[in-house]
């Protein structure tokens, strides 16, 4: 049973629901504690990765360590601009993969050469942060990346750093959407989903590191290697 109401909403409505998980009765407060609890990958980052980065990069405290800021899942195609109904499979696919409702991406201005009008829908995207981000990362590392056999056909990646935003991004393009377990059982519904771009962005709280792009790039590489992400 999916839960879409927040804790404050339930308090206002004076509702006290109980759910069964693995044949045991779980109260409302316990269910919310399970939903917002730190994931295994979060505990691994706080207890092991941060201490390892402090030793390697000579940080004064753990708060200066580079961290994963957000994960952006994006999909777009020229077919979405012509037919509005064709974007529904991609919209549903992103919602099933991330567990979060995506937003539509629209054209910023009209371009007559490409037959585009302003505010015309081009695709959809999702920005993940916090526990949702780590849950998606854990699924991506342990399930999706291990299913890729031919990397040249189903997968492509690129690395880029931005000195203005002090962000070191790592981009992946999963060309085969059936690699995700949520979409594997519904192959016939998501055949038009050509590819899903996944962008990982890091953030540093260290002022010295943020002014030096080369060192920040090294911190980002150390963080990605600690998560054992594919190159």
Curated annotation (Swiss-Prot):
Example of a GO MF term: structural constituent of ribosome
Keywords: Mitochondrion, Ribonucleoprotein, Ribosomal protein
GO terms, biological process: translation
Domain of life: Eukaryota
Pfam families the UniProt entry points to: Ribosomal_L5 (PF00281), Ribosomal_L5_C (PF00673)
Main location per the UniProt record: mitochondrion
A GO-annotated cellular component: mitochondrion
Localization (cell): Mitochondrion
Keyword Ribonucleoprotein: yes
Keyword Ribonucleoprotein: yes
InterPro entries the record matches: Ribosomal_uL5, Ribosomal_uL5_C, Ribosomal_uL5_dom_sf, Ribosomal_uL5_N
Family designation: Belongs to the universal ribosomal protein uL5 family.
Annotated protein name in UniProt: Large ribosomal subunit protein uL5m
Organism, scientific name: Prototheca wickerhamii
Primary gene name: RPL5
